[in-house]
A protein has these predicted regions:
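Active-site pocket-lining/capping segments in soluble small-molecule metabolic enzymes
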Residues: 1-150, 155-299
């Protein structure tokens, strides 16, 4: 049994202004927020990052400013360096190494890196042992035994399974306590559960981050043209909602939950924060503190 839900939030470089407003509320108005919820980390990568993967990044905030903000609030930073196609010559990339040094030397909570490539994982262990490693969901671990083996790897402090394992309760229950502590569920994925191209989609992002000239992946999922909609994600059989966390996952011994949203707009990411962290009766107050005033026009 776990009593605290620990959330790992998107937008380390994309949503500085949002978190600059949200985190003070989280500290000073705890009555707005659910009991037993904490922010474990904020993850992301700057735009045009060679080691980046998973999603195209568009974050432009000053890394020093974001790290100072997270130190102030005692929150871990995670670099999303989940490119699956890295080669030896890519490891010397100056920009990515500079970011790793920044996190390794920043003080405050221990920071980490989300990785796919075993080559990169080995390099980071050797050169930046201060950083913990997270096994990326871009590995698309849909077979439970492969996922179990990943949790057994000492390299990783956390492992994010494919979202289609979210409701494999009978198998998840068989994990040992130490394994459960490493599991980090992706809660709000909007991808079609029948998708067979998820790994290929991630590989396209990896190739393009390496500067390769390749076409964008064309999603064949039903309603793909709509893009991400939170309402659609909520209807997914793999969706993990607040009540699921309280009544199922915490009692089973799981406590880490990842919220996706790096490639989305800050308004939608705020809705994720409101849904997962803020009591319904206080959500309007949080909106008012962050952006909503009596002169705001939408149309």
């Amino acid at each position: 049994m776990r009593n605290t839900a620990i959330y790992h939030l998107p937008g380390l470089f994309e949503f500085y202004e949002l978190y600059r407003r949200f985190l003070p509320l989280f500290r000073t108005h705890r009555e707005y927020f659910y009991d037993g919820c904490e922010i474990g980390s904020i993850y992301g990568a700057p735009e045009n990052c060679l080691w980046g993967g998973g999603r195209f990044s568009c974050g432009e905030c000053d890394p020093q400013a974001m790290m100072a903000l997270l130190r102030e609030y005692g929150i871990s930073a995670r670099l999303t360096f989940s490119n699956s196609l890295l080669r030896e010559e890519h490891l010397a990339d100056e920009r990515c190494n500079t970011l790793c040094r920044l996190l390794a030397e920043s003080g405050g909570p221990r920071n980490g890196v989300i990785v796919h490539s075993d080559l990169l994982a080995g390099y980071l262990k050797e050169h930046y042992p201060q950083l913990y490693l997270v096994s990326s969901t871009t590995k698309v671990l849909t077979e439970f035994e492969a996922f179990r083996q990943e949790t057994a790897r000492e390299d990783f402090a956390y492992v994010v399974p494919d979202f289609r394992l979210n409701k494999a309760f009978a198998q998840l229950e068989t994990l040992a306590r130490a394994e459960k502590d490493k599991v980090e569920f992706l809660c709000n994925e909007c991808c079609w559960t029948g998708c067979r191209d998820r790994k290929r989609c991630y590989e396209v992002v990896s190739r393009q981050n390496l500067g390769e000239d390749c076409p964008d992946h064309r999603c064949a999922a039903p309603d793909a043209a709509q893009g991400y909609r939170f309402s659609k994600a909520m209807r997914s059989p793999a969706f993990i909602g607040v009540e699921d966390i309280k009544k199922t996952y915490l009692p089973m011994g799981f406590s880490n939950f990842k919220i996706e949203g790096r490639g989305l707009g800050s308004a939608l990411v705020l809705e994720f924060l409101l849904y997962y962290l803020v009591k319904p009766e206080h959500q309007l107050e949080v909106r008012e503190e962050i952006y909503l005033d009596n002169m705001l026009d939408l149309f």
